[in-house]
Amino acid sequence: MSCVQTGSFTGPLSSRIGQQPFRDGLKVREEQPTFWGYTPHYGQVEVRMRARVTPRSMFAFWMSGIEDRPERSGEICVAEVFGETILDDSAEVGIGVERLGDPALSQEFSAHRIEIDVSEFHTYGVEWRPGHLEFTIDGEVVGRVQQSPDYPMQLMLGVFDFPAKAGATEDETAIPELVVAHVRGNPRL
């Protein structure tokens, strides 16, 4: 996994307070200073990127609550593509809201088959307003959600590889690639 994020937060050493817990029982092993880099609260955000992934890898652009309070943990998924969903002329692009620990949100995430070559540059964006999200690819609306997180969020860009998923004929040395041309944000609308 390789990921860039625009904010960072951890609780005290040995606490269970921190960002993006991927399983129960995790504890802070190393405190980090809190960093609120680019953490918008509403507005328009876009990333122009391209990726080369295999069936065992994926790439994503999402926004996550900084989790300074457990309930500020929802996510806005602007683009999530698993390599196994890529065909010659299309891919399934996941968009929506992930509830996680935010009781004010409902899980509302889906993958849409889009005619797209993800190895070419495309602009993935979201217009984020109170109670509303509108997702776009290259300026075309691909989805809407009638809810939204109501707190600052950090941006996250990541490429993930899952070697254990490699097929018998797959090149085990293949390295996924995510290239970002720009990240752009317009503050609160």
Predicted features along the sequence, with ranges:
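GH16 jelly-roll
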Residues: 1-189
